[in-house]
Curated annotation (Swiss-Prot):
Residues 430-455 are annotated as: Zinc finger-like. It comes from Arabidopsis thaliana. One of its GO terms (molecular function) is zinc ion binding. Residues 12-43, 340-356 have a biased composition (Polar residues). It comes from the Eukaryota. Residues 71-84, 142-160, 178-189 have a biased composition (Low complexity). Residues 1-189, 201-220, 316-367 are annotated as: Disordered. One of its GO terms (cellular component) is COPII vesicle coat. This is Protein transport protein SEC24 C. Belongs to the SEC23/SEC24 family. SEC24 subfamily. Component of the coat protein complex II (COPII), that covers ER-derived vesicles involved in transport from the endoplasmic reticulum to the Golgi apparatus. COPII is composed of at least five proteins: the SEC23/24 complex, the SEC13/31 complex, and the protein SAR1. Acts in the cytoplasm to promote the transport of secretory, plasma membrane, and vacuolar proteins from the endoplasmic reticulum to the Golgi complex. Mainly expressed at low levels in pollen, leaves, roots and stems. Residues 1-10, 45-70 have a biased composition (Pro residues). GO terms for biological process: endoplasmic reticulum to Golgi vesicle-mediated transport; intracellular protein transport.
């Protein structure tokens, strides 16, 4: 069992590096009801994968990393957590970090260093892990932390624009390629940075690196969308990875040198894939994909079939009107594309034979060897070859975007990121575009000059950095310098990168003590969670803490050691707030530890008789900010009711909206947008002073999530929602969420910038961050066409302060080859990134457009890409076949799931939809697909099912046809877990799982426990493994058939026909019909 880190446990990158904490002390569709005008569904697929070829889960967090073997690496059996417990409890204890790690100047980089994860702040490693969620010019973030989510700081993405001359694209259309390189907004307000959410750039919306306004916690990575017209280099070898076969300990993952390469099998939904977890391969036979055409081959627009291309026909009941359809009269639901399974972990080398390797699926289990390009955990592109022209990108119908998450959590067996100190001179940079030295800058003139791979400028090599070139034209010391042979590296920042001395680590807790919060137990749960995580805060004189409570007034506490007990200081004016005795409100943890623990014990009883129903949330947040303003840091707010008095007071818009507005139109425009600009204005100020705000909503009513979530989104923070809050089942999740937020690797005062090769321009940014300056660099003129055979580079630079007060620059570089062939783009498509981009775009559109229009745009985005493939790349001439490219064969399924997701429904709570939108904005790429297409497993047969060594059984398709009244099923989407119990479950199974004899006896306030039998133990192990994969403590909700909770569970059966959309088979028919209409 993998347990969360208990109080006193070490922080990540301390003596031990651990993952996120895990524990605490519709109706059935008719597959035959198809639309007319369809004859066949065909798939272009590679040969079936060998059995057991999927990735396996990595060792549990907190386990010592496994070094890479010298020759045949052996991954070993799946690792399990600690021995079973009677019920989930706090994680095993770990030591707290002591002080900042010493930073030395690395003389050289040893290539034979074992790929182990750092166990503490090493002398040459970054102070925090590389691990949760946006970039162009510099983006500022209050604080960045490396969270379990994919994205750095708040999550976001950066989209790159096509070259100049291109017209703006509609939703779902690929961005035009802009000329010139572009950088993320130079004005993102910095703050703590974390690896939580991803940021997305133009071209997509993956969770990528974000720039929070203040402290940056590990947010999701932002995505950056690159422009469509880059230049090219020698065309890369065929994209696609060869199939992984057998069960070797670690299977090397490399791109084949000759076509045709087989694509990766569908990956499981978990962040690390679980062995035996994915769906089995479809029953239909598949043919190998085409290899890449020769380098100089011209585009094959409208040309005949490419060699080795084949399809699988799936007969249907529908044909052209009046036509006779031979063969079976039904589509077999078992033969349509579904996520595949893979169980074997792989070793992925980022470059091979001087070209980029296509990355494995984001949800699979892989160990990265950085051989020049950065790990795909830090930066992924939606297409792994860059189109040479904007017209080619436009024709493909696909998005071009970068998913950036510079602080993503790395695999325990991966080599730590190297830290390089150039001394007072700072890192070597291009004097024109300011790009950082990287493996793709070419040295010439015996090493005296180098050519920038971003702007093409020839610069002088600094004297103290000169080295002669070898016969191959490379520097002789290239393998000894991490910045010349690694795609990700950290530089020690010099004084020119500091506006002020590095800020200390400040943690301020703000607790709701209104009558509702006291009565529901939310206040007690918050105080208990804070008290337990105090021991996990970094030790030393640089750690400061503060605490305040609020109802209709604000209460600060003097924590100075000189006082015998904490002294309450009340601020009654909630319209013009102030902070009394600022120096006594935020104090060193070492000075106030005893007072703070005493205060946290006392708060629930101090206010237990309170009858104050109002909340001055806005005023309290403003007052806490004033207390932190001089230092910056992380502000964690625990809120239970709607802010009703003082600054930023809100009204219950939900009831008014339901009564007076159409859910399909005005609701989206009003209730999902902030009520006014008050909180947004406050948030921008917070970000400017490096204050990051995280909000923990422990409520049982409407709190206007759309308005209050503006603060975390702007400052690089996160929103955690516990609705309806239960004092019985929610405290464990609250504790684990808070612990992971605090203990994940993180930094402060973060600013990020993304640079692209000339010919490409960042067009749009998405994620949780604050932009201060749209652009801060004067770019030279750029061509709008890239050269076939050249390479296009992207670089993300994150400037941040570690928790030990060291200023660092994490530089992540990705170089991809350019192509002028449309077929190469489809082979190089990255489904995970493409879908994450579309998901984030849809979330951004929901508050301002009618839902039917958002759904239509998402569907058209899928249709346009498949139409382009059918028209220009497919070899079949019959219009009665639906041709799906291998890389995007699951795109229709995930698009359908998106249109049925919580954010696009009209029957849910407004706060639920607002939370979904906010959650997606910083969502990491590995968590995008599971959010809309969850993983479902059967529980009742875990003790008899052969899982082939995996803790998790293979997932089940999301269709009610696969649910039995005699079964128990568990469904999870990375945030919540639903446990469905059928009406006729055998009493023996119920006794083993719940210690009851009938389903009616199971309490609705369900708390998972482990009993002394094999079935219960295996279910607990499965839940713990999922929590480890998701870096989240899933809250488990009990669902019973015939009750509203049962309908909630069935609403996730996205393959069924429901009120919110057609069945999966029917949707494929609709997509096929639309493609036919375009073809005609």
């Amino acid at each position: 069992m993998v347990a969360p880190v208990p109080p006193g446990a070490p922080r990540p990158n301390s003596q031990q590096n651990s993952g996120p904490p895990n524990f605490y002390p519709g109706s059935q569709g008719n597959s035959n009801a198809l639309a007319d005008n369809m004859q066949n569904l065909s798939l272009n697929r590679p040969p079936p994968m060998m059995p057991g070829s999927g990735p396996r889960p990595p060792p549990p967090f907190g386990q010592s990393p496994q070094p890479f073997p010298q020759q045949s690496p052996s991954y070993g059996a799946p690792q399990r957590g600690p021995s079973p417990m009677s019920r989930p409890g706090p994680p095993a204890g770990m030591a707290r970090p002591g002080g900042p790690p010493p930073v030395s100047q690395p003389a050289g980089f040893q290539s034979n260093v074992p790929l182990n994860r750092p166990t503490g702040p090493p002398s040459r490693q970054p102070s925090f892990g590389s691990r949760p969620s946006m970039p162009g010019g510099p983006v500022a973030q209050p604080a960045a932390s490396s969270s379990g989510f994919p994205a750095f700081g708040p999550s976001g993405s950066v989209a790159a624009g096509p070259p100049p001359g291109s017209r703006p694209m509609a939703f779902g259309s690929p961005p035009p390629v802009g000329s010139g390189m572009s950088m993320p907004p130079s004005g993102m307000i910095g703050g703590p940075v974390s690896n939580g959410h991803q940021m997305v750039g133009s071209g997509g919306f993956p969770r990528g690196t974000q720039f929070p306004g203040a402290a940056v916690t590990t947010p999701q990575a932002p995505y950056v969308r690159p422009p469509s017209a880059p230049y090219a280099r020698t065309p890369p070898q065929p994209l696609g990875s060869h199939s992984l076969s057998g069960n070797p300990p670690l299977t090397p993952f490399t791109a084949p040198s000759m076509p045709p390469p087989a694509t990766f099998p569908g990956a499981p939904h978990g962040r690390p894939a679980v062995s035996g977890l994915p769906y089995g391969p479809p029953s239909a036979q598949v043919a190998p994909p085409l290899g890449f055409p020769g380098q100089m081959q011209p585009p094959r627009y409208g040309m005949g079939p490419l060699p080795n291309q084949s399809m699988t026909n799936i007969p249907t009941a529908m044909g052209q009107p009046g036509a006779t359809v031979p063969g079976p009269s039904r589509i077999d639901p078992n033969q349509i594309p579904r996520p595949g399974s893979s169980s074997s972990p792989t070793v992925f080398e980022t470059r091979q034979s001087n070209q980029a390797n296509p990355p494995p699926p984001a949800t699979s289990d892989y160990v990265v060897r950085d051989t020049g390009n950065c790990s795909p955990r830090y930066m992924r592109c939606t297409i792994n070859q860059i189109p040479c022209t904007v017209d080619l990108l436009s024709t493909s119908g696909m998005q071009l975007a970068l998913m950036v998450q510079p602080l993503a959590l790395s695999h325990p067996s991966e080599e730590p990121i190297q830290v390089v100190d150039f001394g007072e001179g700072g890192p070597v940079r291009c004097s024109r575009c300011k790009g950082y030295i990287n493996p793709f800058m070419k040295f010439i003139d015996q090493g005296r000059k180098f050519i920038c791979n971003f702007c093409g400028y020839t610069d002088e090599t600094p004297r103290d950095y000169h080295c002669n070139l070898g016969p191959d034209g490379r520097r002789r010391d290239v393998d000894e310098r991490p910045e010349l042979c690694r795609g990700t590296v950290e530089f020690v920042a010099t004084k020119e990168y500091m506006v002020r001395d590095p800020m200390p680590a400040v943690y301020f807790f703000l607790i709701d003590v209104s009558m509702n919060a006291i009565q529901t137990g939310a206040t007690a749960a918050a105080c208990n969670a804070i008290q337990q995580v105090l021991s996990d805060l970094p030790e030393g004189p640089r750690t400061f803490v503060g605490i305040a409570t609020f109802d209709s007034t604000i209460h600060f506490y003097n924590l100075k050691r000189a006082l015998q007990q904490p002294l309450m200081l009340i601020v009654p004016d909630v319209q013009d707030v102030y902070t009394p005795l600022e120096t006594d409100v935020v104090v060193q943890l070492s000075e106030c530890r005893q007072h703070l623990e005493l205060l946290l014990d006392s708060i629930p009883t101090m206010f237990q008789e309170s009858k104050i129903p109002e909340s001055a949330f806005g005023a309290a947040v403003k007052a806490a900010f004033l207390a932190m303003k001089s230092k910056g840091g992380k502000l964690m707010v625990f809120q239970s009711i709607l802010c009703s008095v003082g600054v930023g007071a809100l009204s219950s818009r939900e009831a008014e909206g339901r009564a007076n507005m159409s859910a399909g139109e005005k609701e989206a425009h009003k209730l999902l947008q902030p009520a006014d600009k008050t909180l947004k204005t406050m948030a921008i100020e917070f970000a400017e002073y490096q204050v990051c705000v995280d909000i923990f909503i422990t409520t049982q009513a409407y709190v206007d999530m759309a308005s209050i979530s503006v603060i975390p989104r702007t400052t690089g923070g996160q929103v955690y929602c516990y609705y309806p809050f239960s004092a019985l089942s929610d405290p464990p999740k609250l504790y684990n969420d808070l612990k992971w937020n605090i203990t994940r690797p993180q930094g402060f005062e973060a600013v990020m910038r993304v640079r692209c090769s000339q010919g490409i321009q960042v067009q749009e940014y998405s994620g949780n961050f604050c932009k201060r300056i749209p652009t801060d660099i004067d770019l030279p003129a750029h061509d709008d066409k890239l050269q076939d055979g050249a390479e296009c580079a992207f670089q993300c630079a994150l400037l941040y302060t570690t928790i030990y007060g060291e200023r660092r620059i994490r530089v992540t570089t990705l170089s991809l080859s350019c192509t002028n062939m449309l077929s190469n783009l489809f082979r190089a498509a990255d489904l995970d990134s493409q879908f994450a981009c579309m998901l984030k775009q849809a979330a951004n559109e929901i508050p301002s457009k009618a839902l039917p229009l958002v759904k239509e745009q998402a569907t058209n985005s899928c249709i346009n890409a498949l139409y382009a493939y059918r028209k220009f790349c497919a070899t079949v001439t019959s219009s009665g076949q639906l041709i799906l490219p291998e890389a995007l064969k699951l795109f229709p399924l995930y698009t359908l799931a998106l249109t049925k997701s919580v954010g696009l429904r009209t029957d849910g709570r407004i706060d639920d939809r607002s939370f979904w939108i906010n959650y997606v904005s910083s969502l990491s790429t590995p968590l995008a697909i599971p959010l809309v297409y969850p993983r479902m497993i059967s529980v009742h047969d875990l003790d008899v099912k052969d899982t082939e060594g995996s803790v998790l059984p293979p997932p089940i398709p999301l269709s009610s046809e696969h649910i039995s009244n005699e079964g128990v099923y568990f469904l999870e989407n990375g945030e919540d877990g639903l446990l469905f119990v059928g009406e006729s479950v055998d009493s023996d199974i119920l006794q083993k799982l719940f210690a009851v004899s009938s389903a009616a006896e199971i309490p609705n306030q369900f708390v998972l426990q482990q009993y002394d039998n094999q079935l219960s133990k295996k279910f607990n192990d499965a839940v713990n493994e999922i929590r480890r994969q998701r870096c989240s403590y899933l809250r488990i909700k009990l669902c019973k058939k015939g009750e509203p909770s049962g309908m909630l569970f069935l609403s996730y059966m996205v393959e069924d026909r429901t009120a919110s959309g057609p069945s999966y088979v029917e949707f494929l028919v609709q997509v096929h019909r639309q493609i036919q209409l375009k073809m005609n």
